[in-house]
């Protein structure tokens, strides 16, 4: 317990292609981390007023896609990416929830940013370690992969 106390963790995982917006697993793990004295940076509950990804935000993005208003999407997502990547900068380590049946884009970017910054990346794969993308085996320790 002592080694994790006063550290900060970022919770990395899909948000825009999952029914619950990525909230459920984060709500499950957050109290466990806090009990260990770990601060949590959750992109579903950002510590800022900007770049909030709630139902209204997702609906606005989907409507913009239908209307081919790609400029709106770019401006909106640029802010989201900036805030989320800044949280990676601040975090001491990252916990990533990976469901290989869901297309990940931002999550992989966040994960590889953490790896480049030499921060521990702990990956929990819904389908088991044996189903993780091959690339992950080449860029992170086996000891950081979990089923």
Where are these regions (language model features)?
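Conserved catalytic or regulatory cores that recognize and/or transform ribose-phosphate-containing ligands
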Residues: 1-147
């Amino acid at each position: 317990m002592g080694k994790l106390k006063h550290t900060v963790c970022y919770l990395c995982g899909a948000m825009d292609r999952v029914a619950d917006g990525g909230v459920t697993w984060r709500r499950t793990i957050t109290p466990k981390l806090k009990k260990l004295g770990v601060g949590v940076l959750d992109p579903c509950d950002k510590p800022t007023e900007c770049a909030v990804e709630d139902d209204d935000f997702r609906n606005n993005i989907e409507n913009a896609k239908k209307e081919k208003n790609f400029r709106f999407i770019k401006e909106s997502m640029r802010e989201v990416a900036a805030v989320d990547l800044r949280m990676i900068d601040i975090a001491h380590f990252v916990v990533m929830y990976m469901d290989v049946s869901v297309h990940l884009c931002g999550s992989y970017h966040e994960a590889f940013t953490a790896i480049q910054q030499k921060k521990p990346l702990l990956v929990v794969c819904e389908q088991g370690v044996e189903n993780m993308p091959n690339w992950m085996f080449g860029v992170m320790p086996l000891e950081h992969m979990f089923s």
